[in-house]
């Protein structure tokens, strides 16, 4: 190691001063890479943190998995497949769950299932030669807002009951109970419904959706002997979609 000596500038002629060998720095004593690497390794071992790389591969890239210690993406955004399956079963077999609906299912505001059902309804109409995606989502949005406000007016004066009734709860219930009308639109692909048989079948599917949705809302609002009163506006709401399948 050399440095410029300013004190003996006149004697040495302004040159560089080379220290003796006894003051030389030993080789490798200032190797920062080894020191930092060893300290980091010691800290990692002390903290118990192990290397945690992401899995590689095209399948992992398209999946919703992240690091092993992190929750899945679907869980973080609130999509629960168990609730989706349970709600779908309740709509398909309403008599089986006639004793009561769990409060956890009623308070679930999942909209993944309703969006899928409305998309299937539009696709089935498209396969039947009817393009009504704008009408479907427009009527669904306007009807959900109207039925939510009406349900709040019909709910009890209990504060806890009113706080449980949120807009997305109403939208989730109406969307899941829309599933029978998807079967109606699927039937319209293979057979025309603008006849007496089609009218009867459409009425049955509308009643199916109305009965299940009124049961959900009646349990959520904790009303007594008011299911038929709730069912009347729901019947009108689902009848609009049945008319799309038959006439439009």
Swiss-Prot record:
Result of changing residue 70 to G: In YIP1-41; lethal; abolishes binding to YIF1, YPT1 and YPT31. In YIP1-40; temperature sensitive; reduces binding to YPT31, and inhibits ER vesicle budding
Superkingdom: Eukaryota
Keyword Transmembrane attached: yes
Effect annotated for changing residue 81 to Y: In YIP1-9; lethal
Residue ranges of the TM segments: 111-131, 133-153, 173-193, 197-217, 228-248
Localization of this protein: Endoplasmic reticulum membrane; Golgi apparatus membrane
InterPro entries linked: Yip1/4-like, Yip1_dom
Outcome after substituting residue 130 to E: In YIP1-44; lethal
Bilayer disposition of the protein: Multi-pass membrane protein
Record annotation: effect of changing residue 130 to A: In YIP1-40; temperature sensitive; reduces binding to YPT31, and inhibits ER vesicle budding
Keywords annotated in UniProt: Endoplasmic reticulum, ER-Golgi transport, Golgi apparatus, Membrane, Protein transport, Transmembrane, Transmembrane helix, Transport
Pfam families for the chain: Yip1 (PF04893)
An example Gene Ontology biological process: protein transport
Keyword Protein transport (UniProt): yes
Regions of this protein lying in the Cytoplasmic compartment: 1-110, 154-172, 218-227
GO annotation, cellular component aspect: COPII-coated ER to Golgi transport vesicle; endoplasmic reticulum; endoplasmic reticulum membrane; Golgi membrane; trans-Golgi network
Lumenal compartment residues: 132, 194-196
Chief location bin: endoplasmic reticulum
Free-text function comment from the UniProt entry: Required for fusion of ER-derived vesicles with the Golgi during ER-to-Golgi protein transport, probably by mediating correct membrane localization of YPT1.
Family: Belongs to the YIP1 family.
Quaternary data: Component of the YIP1-YIF1 complex, composed of at least YIF1, YIP1 and YOS1. The complex interacts with the ER to Golgi SNAREs BOS1 and SEC22. Interacts with the prenylated form of the Rab GTPases YPT1 and YPT31. Interacts with the YIP1 family members YIP4 and YIP5. Interacts with SNX3, YIP3 and YOP1.
Protein name: Protein transport protein YIP1
């Amino acid at each position: 190691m050399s440095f410029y000596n300013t004190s003996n500038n006149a004697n040495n002629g302004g040159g560089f001063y080379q220290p003796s060998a006894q003051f030389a720095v030993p080789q490798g004593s200032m190797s920062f890479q080894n020191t930092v690497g060893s300290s980091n390794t010691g800290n990692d071992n002390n903290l118990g943190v192990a290397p945690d790389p992401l899995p590689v591969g095209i399948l992992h890239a398209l999946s919703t998995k992240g690091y092993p210690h992190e929750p899945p993406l679907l869980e973080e955004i609130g999509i629960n497949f168990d609730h989706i399956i349970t709600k779908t079963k309740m709509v398909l077999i309403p008599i089986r769950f006639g004793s009561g609906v769990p409060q956890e299912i009623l308070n679930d505001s999942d909209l993944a299932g309703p969006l899928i059902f409305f998309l299937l309804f539009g696709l089935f109409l498209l396969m039947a030669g009817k393009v009504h995606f704008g009408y479907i989502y427009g009527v669904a949005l306007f009807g959900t807002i109207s039925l939510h406000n009406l349900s709040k007016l019909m709910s009890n004066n209990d504060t806890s009951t009113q706080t449980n009734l949120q807009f997305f709860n109403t939208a989730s219930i109406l969307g899941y109970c829309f599933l029978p009308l998807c079967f109606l639109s699927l039937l319209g692909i293979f057979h025309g419904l603008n006849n007496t048989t089609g009218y009867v079948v459409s009425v049955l599917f509308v009643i199916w959706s109305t009965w299940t949705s009124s049961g959900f809302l009646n349990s959520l609002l904790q009303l007594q002997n008011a299911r038929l009163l709730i069912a009347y506006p729901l019947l009108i709401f689902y009848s609009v979609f049945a008319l799309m399948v038959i006439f439009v």
